[in-house]
């Protein structure tokens, strides 16, 4: 899963719980193999993507957390390729999409920009 030629990376330096979710160069590592679950979660290595704080506001960073079916772990994939956090209405955003290095993903108001369009491979 990625945007602007970069891949979403769960990082997972520790056990995964609370690790930041970032975009980085695509390496096909297991921490970049995200799936969209039938329960509307974004998953990697048995962890789910969710905001670092609740309720989130624009600029809230994203983390990997244990999947608990909480409302802030649910996402909507729209026809314009944006991913919306169902509980907040904010879009998954890569603020560093145009940079070459990694950047931590966050939530932002939906603008339809290239840094909010996601593809699954």
Locations of the language-model features?
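Lectin-like carbohydrate-binding module/patch detector with strong preference for beta-trefoil
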Residues: 1-121
């Amino acid at each position: 899963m990625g945007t602007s030629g970069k891949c979403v990376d769960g990082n997972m330096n520790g056990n995964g719980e609370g690790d930041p979710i970032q975009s980085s160069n695509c390496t096909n590592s297991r921490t970049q193999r995200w799936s969209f679950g039938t329960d509307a979660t974004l998953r990697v290595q048995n962890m789910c993507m969710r905001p670092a704080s609740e309720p989130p506001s624009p600029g809230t960073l994203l983390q990997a957390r244990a999947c608990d079916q909480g409302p802030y772990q649910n996402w909507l994939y729209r026809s314009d390729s944006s991913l919306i956090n169902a509980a907040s209405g904010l879009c998954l955003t890569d603020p560093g999409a145009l940079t070459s290095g990694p950047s931590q993903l966050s939530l932002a108001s939906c603008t339809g920009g290239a840094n909010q369009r996601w593809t699954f491979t």
